C-alpha cells in the first residue's frame, strides 16, 4: 500500500527509483522496530479474493474506476510484484502471500496466532505499519500497536470492540460495503444509502448486546454480511491455516541463508550496500 501510494503521488514508473524507495522504507522500519518487535513480516495481497466470492460487490467500484483511469495500473502492479518477488528471494524478511487472501487476513491471523487470554505469558508484540484504519480492531489484543506512514504517527482507539461494531454497522464505502440498513447493490448501482444516525448505531449495538430475537431484526442479515467482510476474525479457517503454515515454513536458518544474497543483489541493482550491513552475512576478517 505504501509503495503503490508513492507511485501514484510521484507519477513515476521508474523501476529503479521505486525499488530504492521500497528498500529504503523497509530498511527504516526494520531498524526502528526490530529490537522491540522482532523480525519484519511483509503481508501481501493475492488474487482470487475470498471476500469477492462471498460478496461480488466487494471493491467492485475500484475495479471499475481502474478500468476507466488513465493511470497504468497494470504497469504499477507489474513493477510491485517483481520487486516483491526479489525481496522474498534475496532478503531475510518473511514475505507471506496466500492465494485468496488480502494482507488484512495475514495480519489478522498472525497477531492472534498465540493468544494470551489468561495473561499468563508475554505474547509476541506486533507493530502494524499501515495507514489503514481497518486494523484498529486488532488493538483489542494488548500486544498490537499500529503506525501510520501517511500521518507519521501511531494510531489508537479507546475501545477497539466498539470501534469494530461501528465499522460493521456503518459499512465501508471505500470497499463497497454498505451500511446494514442498505441493500447489497447500493454502491454499484449508484444509489444512496439509507441514513444511519449515531443514535441508530447505539440502538443496534444495544440490541446486539442484549442478544434477543436478533434473527427477527430487519438489519440482522446485513449485519452478518458486513461482519463477514470487516471482522478480521472471519477469515476462513482453511486460509488461516495456510497463512500460519507459510509463516512457520520460513525458518530462522532459511532467513539467515538469504543474508548471503543481499550484497550481490544490492550491487546488481545499484543500491548502496553500506546502508544494509545489518542484513548481510558478516565477512571474515583478513589475517
Predicted regions and their residues:
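Helix-hairpin-helix
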Residues: 164-216
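Short, polar loop motifs at secondary-structure junctions
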Residues: 131-135
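Phosphate-backbone recognition surface of nucleic-acid-processing proteins
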Residues: 204-246
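Catalytic core of IPPT-family isopentenyl/dimethylallyl transferases
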Residues: 265, 269-275
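Conserved small/polar residues in nucleotide/adenosyl-binding loops
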Residues: 277-283
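Glycine- and acidic-residue-rich phosphate-binding/metal-coordinating active-site segment common to enzymes
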Residues: 148-170
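Noncatalytic, basic helical substrate-engagement surface that gates or grips nucleic-acid strands
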Residues: 1-127, 137-153, 231, 237-238, ...
Amino acid at each position: 500500500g505504501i509503495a503503490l501510494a508513492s507511485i501514484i503521488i510521484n507519477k513515476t514508473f521508474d523501476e529503479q527509483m521505486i525499488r530504492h524507495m521500497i528498500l529504503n522504507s523497509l530498511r527504516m522500519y526494520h531498524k526502528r522496530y526490530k529490537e522491540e518487535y522482532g523480525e519484519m513480516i511483509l503481508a501481501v495481497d493475492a488474487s482470487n479474493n475470498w471476500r469477492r466470492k462471498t460478496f461480488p460487490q466487494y471493491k467492485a467500484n475500484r475495479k471499475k474506476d481502474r478500468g476507466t483511469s488513465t493511470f497504468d495500473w497494470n504497469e504499477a502492479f507489474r513493477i510491485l510484484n517483481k520487486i516483491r518477488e526479489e525481496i522474498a528471494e534475496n532478503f531475510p524478511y518473511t514475505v507471506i502471500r496466500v492465494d485468496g487472501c488480502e494482507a488484512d487476513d495475514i495480519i489478522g491471523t498472525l497477531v492472534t496466532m498465540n493468544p494470551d487470554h489468561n495473561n499468563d505469558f508475554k505474547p509476541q508484540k506486533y507493530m502494524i505499519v499501515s495507514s489503514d484504519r481497518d486494523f484498529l480492531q486488532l488493538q483489542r489484543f494488548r500486544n498490537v500497536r499500529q503506525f501510520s506512514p501517511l500521518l507519521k504517527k501511531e494510531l489508537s482507539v479507546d475501545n477497539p470492540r466498539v470501534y469494530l461494531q461501528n465499522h460493521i454497522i456503518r459499512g465501508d464505502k471505500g470497499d463497497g460495503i454498505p451500511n446494514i440498513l442498505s441493500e447489497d447493490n447500493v454502491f454499484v448501482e449508484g444509489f444512496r444509502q439509507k441514513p444511519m444516525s449515531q443514535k441508530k448505531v447505539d440502538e443496534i449495538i444495544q440490541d446486539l448486546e442484549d442478544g434477543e430475537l436478533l434473527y427477527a431484526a430487519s438489519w440482522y442479515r446485513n449485519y452478518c454480511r458486513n461482519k463477514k467482510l470487516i471482522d478480521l476474525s472471519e477469515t476462513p479457517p482453511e486460509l488461516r491455516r495456510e497463512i500460519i503454515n507459510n509463516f512457520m515454513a520460513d525458518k530462522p536458518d532459511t532467513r539467515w541463508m538469504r543474508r548471503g544474497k543481499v550484497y550481490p543483489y544490492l550491487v546488481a541493482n545499484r543500491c548502496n550496500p553500506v546502508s544494509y550491513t545489518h542484513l548481510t552475512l558478516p565477512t571474515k576478517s583478513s589475517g
